[in-house]
């Protein structure tokens, strides 16, 4: 039997304690708990995209009731459509000449990235300006010089002229129609001819007299020209000028007339037979959408009845049913491609075929028209 003394017991206890301490010291030292990760900072809001700045240049006042008014109505329509994505401005009554270059250059220099120059006479100024502003897109109405950062666009106004002619041919009592012409360029000559062709489709005895004012917007001259035509036997007047002066004159003289570019009914409600209008909104909407989506390209666009860019509206109550039916027939044909206004045989004043029987004039031919068709009196100014 083994006996342990008190001293021995104390010694064993001490050794035991040291061993325990040593074992504890050999264990892994406990690390402090990591600090919680800071919450992620809120993402900074993306900077607001600046609106596309768009400028319009008009040849007449926006209150002309016709051409410039139609463009400005389309400007307002795209403002409503695109909201804060765009910012528009306009300058009215810009003369076609040296001053036009200054005005359009200022538009480009002032941060506008899309510029609409809405008259034929702005073509050369735009050609001079465009190379200096490669990041600006220029759209020139009724012109033909496109490329680079310049596109051109037009409306087939001759289709509206033809539709008006249908009514005139059905309703004239004198068989003499009158046209107040603005500037003798192919666009206007084409409209005079198409008006006459439309009238002759209803009444082959029609003749058309023309008086030129050599300006787009010149109410006093337009009034004088309209009066001259009425005195010359015309009982229905048509115009390719920008103010309602022709319609007003017809109202005062007890004759009939058409509105042009915009609905002009209010300017001569008794004289008004209908208005051949241009709707620029579809094209302007397309261009803005293309620019916003980096899809814009330089090209020439020529829209008409098919694209809802041309129509005749607000027909007078006394327009006969046969004329209304003919108008609807022609519009349907223009939309589905089964009808062409300039399909031969079409003859000039001398009786020469300018479009052969069964042939359809192409757009290049249409853009270069500088002659009158059979039934139009006088000569095209400047034509050989």
Where are these regions (language model features)?
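Secretory targeting signals
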Residues: 1-4, 15-19
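N-terminal export leaders
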Residues: 6-10
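N-terminal helix-turn-helix DNA-binding module of bacterial transcription factors
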Residues: 11-12, 27-29
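A residue-level marker of the well-folded mature domains of exported/periplasmic proteins
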Residues: 29-384
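Short hydrophobic/aromatic segments of transmembrane alpha-helices and their interfaces
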Residues: 11, 16, 323-324
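C-terminal motif of bacterial Sec signal peptides marking the signal peptidase cleavage site
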Residues: 22-25
């Amino acid at each position: 039997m083994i006996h342990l003394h008190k001293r021995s017991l104390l010694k064993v206890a001490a050794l035991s304690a040291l061993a325990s301490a040593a074992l504890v010291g050999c264990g892994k030292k406990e690390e402090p708990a990591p600090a919680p990760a800071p919450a992620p900072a809120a993402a900074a809001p993306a900077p607001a995209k600046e609106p596309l700045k768009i400028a319009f240049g008009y040849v007449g006042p926006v209150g002309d009731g016709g051409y410039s008014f139609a463009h400005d109505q389309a400007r307002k329509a795209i403002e409503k459509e695109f909201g804060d994505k765009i910012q528009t401005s306009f300058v009215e009554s810009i003369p076609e000449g040296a001053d036009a270059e200054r005005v359009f250059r200022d538009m480009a220099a002032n941060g506008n990235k899309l510029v609409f120059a809405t008259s034929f006479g702005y073509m050369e100024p735009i050609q001079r300006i465009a190379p200096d502003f490669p990041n600006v897109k220029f759209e020139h109405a009724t012109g033909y010089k496109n490329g680079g950062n310049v596109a051109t666009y037009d409306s087939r106004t001759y289709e509206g002229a033809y539709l008006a002619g249908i009514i005139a041919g059905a309703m004239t009592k004198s068989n003499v129609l009158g046209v107040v012409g603005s500037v003798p360029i192919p666009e206007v000559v084409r409209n005079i001819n198409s008006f006459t062709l439309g009238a002759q489709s209803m009444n082959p005895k029609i003749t058309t007299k023309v008086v030129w004012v050599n300006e787009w917007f010149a109410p006093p001259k337009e009034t004088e020209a309209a009066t001259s035509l009425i005195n010359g036997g015309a009982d229905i007047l048509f115009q390719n000028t920008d103010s309602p002066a022709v319609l007003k004159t017809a109202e005062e003289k007890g004759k009939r007339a058409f509105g042009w570019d915009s609905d002009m009914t209010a300017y001569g409600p008794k004289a008004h037979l209908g208005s051949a209008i241009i709707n620029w909104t579809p094209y302007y909407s397309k261009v803005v959408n293309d620019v916003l989506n980096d899809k814009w390209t330089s090209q020439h666009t020529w829209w008409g009845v098919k694209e809802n860019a041309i129509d005749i509206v607000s027909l007078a109550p006394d327009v006969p049913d046969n004329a209304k039916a003919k108008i609807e027939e022609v519009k349907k044909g223009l939309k589905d491609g089964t009808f062409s206004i300039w399909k031969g045989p079409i003859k000039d004043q001398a009786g020469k075929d300018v479009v052969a029987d069964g042939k359809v004039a192409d757009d290049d031919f249409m853009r270069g028209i500088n002659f009158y068709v059979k039934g139009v009196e006088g000569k095209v100014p400047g034509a050989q």
